[in-house]
Every structure is written in C-alpha cells, then in structure tokens.
C-alpha cells in the first residue's frame, strides 16, 4: 500500500492535489481526523483485499489542534507498519493566499468574528507546524497556476521510476522570487548574460544559439564543473539518509537563459548516477 498525506494552508492547492491523485488511481479521503491514521494503516494490513493499494488523505487545520500536535507520533505508528508513506505540504505566501480567498470569496475555516482573514492565514501555519516539520515534500504554489500545479504534482509524486530519493533540478529567475521549497540553491547571476545580446534575447537556454554562446564562456564552464562536482559528491549522501525528495534550484535573473542551460547540463550529467532525477524550468512560459 502507498499512502500520501496531503496538507497545507487553506488556498494552497490541497483540493487540486487530491483531484490529481484521484485521477491517477488513488482512493482519496478529504479531511481525515489525524487520530484515525494508525487505524487506517491497521485496516490496510488486515484487509488488503478490501482497501485500495494507493490511498491519499488530506489532514489540515480543520482537525482538532490536539490531534495535529500528535501528528509526529501518529506518523511514526503508520510507518512502523512498513507502509510506504509520503507527507506532502503545499503552501504559498500570505499575500497570494489572501488574493485567492478574495477572488473565490470562500470562507477560511479559521475566520470568525474576532479573527480576520489575514490573522487566520498566519495562525494556520502555527497549527500545522508539526506537519510542516515532518513533510517529505514541500511545494510552494505562489507562482503556479492550476495547470502548472497539476504538472508539478504529477512530476514529483507520480513519476518516480523506481524506489529511492526523487531528485529535481529546477531553474528559476530571482526576479520572481526564490523557490522556498528548494533544499539547495545555486545563484548563477554572476555569469555572462545572453539577455544583453540582442540576437539571443528571445531565445532560452534550451535553444542552440544560447547553448553555443554559454558553452564558449570559461566562467560558465567553471561554474558547471564546480556545481557538478559538489552535487555528484553530496547528492548520494542525501539519498543514503533516506530523504524522499530533494530539490536543487539554479537561479539567474529571469530564469530563461543561464539557469536553464546549467539545469539541463547538470540533469544530463547526473542522470546516470541518480536514477530518479528530473529537470524542470519554473519560469519558462
């Protein structure tokens, strides 16, 4: 049995995550009381013919605070039964969550006469602290639309070709914010920028003219060799520590040229030693 626990602040995309998982064969349960997690695991062991082999449940701030505080011990009970269990935590910045609630006009579950929407959003993070601390995969949905979030969920949760740590190399542009869910961040803004070459500006790091330009720059090659040497040495150590997911972010100014080029090269260079490796370009249209 595979169990995915989906959590996150309201408006971060939990419903979308459950829909994606359901569309891909998971039996989904929304707003499961956290205290029922061990019972769900026990039933899975005793009645394997009755329960679906892939189950996803959402646990969020609608739970009793006392149950949320017990999440670490409840999770340990589940994993002690040797069930493959991943904890997914979705989030977005406060401003984005406020905007989403304003646009949909939905009521936040924690708002009341004495608590404003902004206060509810802040308080929700405190309530979910125990889940945040034990999340295997965190996804920041601030800059993701509905379709991008669906693609990201499929990429990270459903496309693991074999057991072990799932690695993601992600290019991004600092002008749209640094990905808060990254485990390692490399800033490559010091490298020559193709954007300032008029004939290269409209291309990306996936296009041959930009590839040829950057491949000819000594500083770019040196940066690639240094990052590759670091990742080649240390990523296997992450895998050996039983990490389920590791995200490596490569950032330039706009996320179109230098970071894309280096992410692609690193993906190719590390594909053989790291079987579960994927490359994504956050800011390419």
From Swiss-Prot:
One of its GO terms (molecular function) is GTP binding. ATP binds at residues 8-15. Keywords: ATP-binding, GTP-binding, Nucleotide-binding. Coiled coil: none annotated. Pfam families: PapZ_C, RapZ-like_N. This is Nucleotide-binding protein PST_1028. GTP binds at residues 60-63. Belongs to the RapZ-like family. The keyword Transcription regulation does not apply. Displays ATPase and GTPase activities. Transmembrane segments: none annotated. SUPFAM superfamilies: P-loop containing nucleoside triphosphate hydrolases. NCBIfam families: PRK05416.1.
